[in-house]
Structure formats: C-alpha cells, structure tokens
Amino acid sequence: MAGGSGNSDEELLRAVRIIKILYQSNPYPSPEGSRQARRNRRRRWRARQRQINSLSERILSTCLERPTGPVSLPLPPIERLTLDSAEDIGTGGTDPPQGTETGTGSPNTPEGHSTILGTGAKN
C-alpha cells in the first residue's frame, strides 16, 4: 500500500481470493430431506466450516507473517511481583484507585453492587 510493499499487497489479495474460494466451495446445505438427514448435513457443514476457518487463519498468518501463538509479554523479575496493592499506590506515576482521594466510592465499586444485590436477596 505504501512504497515498495506492492508485492506483499498482491500476496494479501491472492490470499483473500483463496479464502473466498474456500468459503464459496462450502454452501449451506439444502433444506430437503428428513429431519435427521438435514441435521447430519448441517453437522457436516459446520465441521467443514471449522476446517475452512482454521485454514483461513493459517493462510492469513502465513501471508502476514504473524505468530500463530499468543505473544508473550515482558514481565518484571519474580521478586518484584507482589499481591499487595498498597505498595503500588503513589509509585511510578500511577493513578490511585477510584474513591481514595475524596473518600467516596463510585457506583461501579463492589460496595455499590453489594447494596443492589442485598435488596434482591431480601425478597
């Protein structure tokens, strides 16, 4: 799309055409026949759709050269990881949790939900 990426654009268009052909090659089954026959045809159609979906993902990931697995995030050393959120308040320029500056909670806090849930439980 920009500069010298014309070759990759052509590859992407080619991949999209292939995927379109794959989806067009698997039309929805006809509504004729007995209930069991229609159910079996739909079941087989869904199985083919799943295969086409996985093939399409593989084609696009190959074309775009994306990793198929999840991308790992860089984490700090295990010694620096804590479960106590009180240590994190005021460090690193992070915003304090809602309601700590003014002392009032917002309706989205768990306290607000417990009030709503409490009224329903009394009925």
Swiss-Prot record:
Question: What name does this protein carry?
Answer: Protein Rev
InterPro entries, alphabetized: REV_protein
Which intervals of this chain are the motif Nuclear export signal and binding to XPO1? 73-84
* Residues modified as Phosphoserine: 5, 8
Question: In which organism is this protein found?
Answer: Simian immunodeficiency virus (isolate MB66)
Residue stretches of biased makeup (Polar residues): 97-112
Q: Which gene encodes it?
A: rev
The record's subcellular locations are: Host nucleus, Host nucleolus; Host cytoplasm
Q: How is it modified after translation?
A: Asymmetrically arginine dimethylated at one site by host PRMT6. Methylation impairs the RNA-binding activity and export of viral RNA from the nucleus to the cytoplasm. Phosphorylated by protein kinase CK2. Presence of, and maybe binding to the N-terminus of the regulatory beta subunit of CK2 is necessary for CK2-mediated Rev's phosphorylation.
State the family it belongs to: Belongs to the HIV-1 REV protein family.
